[in-house]
Swiss-Prot record:
GO terms for molecular function: DNA binding; single-stranded DNA binding. This is Mitochondrial genome maintenance protein MGM101. Performs an essential function in the repair of oxidatively damaged mtDNA that is required for the maintenance of the mitochondrial genome. Binds to DNA. It comes from the Eukaryota. Belongs to the MGM101 family.
Length: 275
């Protein structure tokens, strides 16, 4: 580097040269490397930054924050939320000196004492084998009306009920809800029913009824109604006696598969046909 003093430059000129150079470099550094603050700011920091950064030399327009940009109405927004039915159980009032029971969270009478011998005989009676049905996948079931008839014989019409304990949980393809079975003013069982549905929101009402029926079947299992349907030895014997497994073909896709059916049924429902 050249020594400016030896070359004959006066000290005053040298000092002015360095000071002006430092000022110019500071301005260039400030314009080139200044970064914008974060998007979310408090009102105090935003106003302070605006007053500090405003200068005649800055020609770039202020940047819009993310919150100021409105989404375009032309772009469809795909919703991933579930349906909300707003069917949570109502809270019971305490105006009757505690006589009203809120069955959405109460366990009143659960396991307090057994039912009478007459009721127990009706509940534990063997299931009529001709009432049992089978699904194509081999699952045995009893129609819901059969459970209701047993409960009516045991407790009498009006002597039992199914009370919801939670709000319905709805997803894109399934609905579920927890119910409690009350018999003669006592909680006897709690179960969560579920039901798959297809076709959108308009199918929710039917799916909710199927969910309630599924919960009733699960609650009746605790009372011993049709307990044979969970006995593996009974299932094997009943299938061998009343059912058969056959090959069927899908009418449209021509795919073949095995399904179960009752021997007494000679036809196959659409869209399958016997091969």
């Amino acid at each position: 580097m050249f020594n400016l003093i030896r070359l004959g430059f006066p000290r005053t000129s040298i000092i002015r040269y360095y000071s002006s150079t430092a000022v110019n470099q500071a301005k260039v550094y400030s314009r080139t490397y200044k970064r914008a603050g974060p998007v979310t700011k408090s009102s105090t920091s935003t106003s302070r930054s605006t007053s500090t950064d405003a200068s005649p030399a800055s020609s770039s327009p202020p940047k819009e924050s993310v919150s100021d940009i409105e989404p375009s109405s032309e772009v469809p927004v795909k919703s991933t939320t579930s349906y909300i039915l707003h069917d949570a159980p109502l809270e019971a009032s305490n105006k009757n000196n505690g006589e009203t029971i809120n069955w959405s969270d109460s366990f009143h009478g659960l396991g307090a004492q057994p039912f009478s011998k007459e009721i127990a005989e009706i509940l534990l009676a063997p299931v009529a084998e001709e009432d049992i049905e089978i699904k194509p996948d081999g699952l045995l079931y009893l129609p819901e009306i059969k459970y209701r008839r047993v409960l009516n014989r045991a407790f009498g019409p009006g002597g039992w009920g199914l009370a919801p304990r939670t709000e319905s949980l709805v997803t894109s393809g399934q609905i579920s809800r927890e119910y409690g079975l009350i018999c003669h003013g006592r909680l006897v069982s709690i179960a969560r029913g579920e039901q798959d549905y297809f076709g959108g929101e308009e199918k929710l009402t039917t799916a909710l009824e199927g969910c309630k029926s599924n919960a009733l079947m699960r609650c009746c299992k605790d009372l011993g109604i049709a307990s044979e349907l969970w006995d593996p030895s009974f299932i094997r014997r009943w299938k061998k006696k009343y059912c058969e497994e056959i090959f069927v073909e899908h009418v449209n896709t021509k795919k073949k598969k095995k399904i179960w059916k009752l021997k007494s049924i000679k036809t196959i429902d659409y869209p399958y046909k016997m091969t």
